[in-house]
Amino acid sequence: MCDEFIHPGLVEDHRLSRRSFGLMTAVAASLPASALAQSEVVEKDVEVKTADGVCDAALFHPAGKGSWPAVLVWPDIMGLRPAFRDMGRRLAAQGYVVLVPNPFYRSAHAPVIGESFDFNNQEQRNRLFGYRSAMTDAGIDHDAQAYLAFLDSQPETAKTKKAGVQGYCMGGALSFRTAAAVPARVAAVGSFHGGNGLVTKEANSPHLLIPKTSATYLVCQAQNDDMQQPQMKDDLKAAFVAAKRPATVEVYQANHGWCVKGGAVYNEGEAERAWAALTKLYQSNLV
């Protein structure tokens, strides 16, 4: 759940620290030549036709000839912005065709926040919540179908391989919905600090959609979300077992928002651990 008690209030500019640069250099040195050759990425701003209009989005894929599995990335409550473009580039460099949509296209063009945005400012926060409220369940399902169809229309997409979807904050719940909306296509779901919206008492709770899916799940929860609703992880595990869906549910030692660079609670160590788990998920299931 994204609220003033959980979500990081300060959105900071993302700059590469010396420590981060050193880590990236060390990782690059350990990669095989084939992985380094794939590090060049093609990036495009695209428009995706949906049932409700046209969504502005960012598309990424490896440079050169070839075809790769499709991945849909749902951003957090603050939408498509540089931090998620960075994420799209990184995924594409690992060998995927990646679409990062503006989830709020019905209300505003991305980016929907500026450099001065402060989540602690009630007026600014309520504006984002208003954008989210404009997204109905049916609308989200239709969007997910349109996004996967768009990915499959790209010549770089390996259509014979399964697709993945990952989401952050509110995007966790949207990823669950995507897996249910396109069950024959989505084989892997990653939810990162998805908050307490994954299990609710409502009839449209995302966890109730699990039996309609054919995916393997990775659910990485924030420690402060878990403190608010400690039973949720057990409810999720039970739902996965009942639906016979493979899943990993883990509470990370970091707060809500820890995976997204540029936020006050970004935790590099735990973010990299979550990314490694995501990489393993995709390598095993997008085949």
Where in this protein do the model-derived segments appear?
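N-terminal secretory signal peptides
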Residues: M1-L16
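N-terminal export leaders
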Residues: L16-S30
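N-terminal cap/lid segment of alpha/beta-hydrolase-fold proteins
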Residues: A35-A63
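Short beta-strand element of the alpha/beta-hydrolase
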Residues: W68-D76
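Gly/Ser-rich "nucleophile elbow"/oxyanion-hole loop immediately N-terminal to the catalytic nucleophile
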Residues: S116-G164
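Primarily recognizes the serine-hydrolase "nucleophile elbow" in alpha/beta-hydrolase
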Residues: A144-P206
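Short beta-strand/loop motif that positions the catalytic acidic residue
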Residues: T213, V219-Q221
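C-terminal catalytic histidine-bearing segment of alpha/beta-hydrolase fold enzymes
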Residues: V241-V287
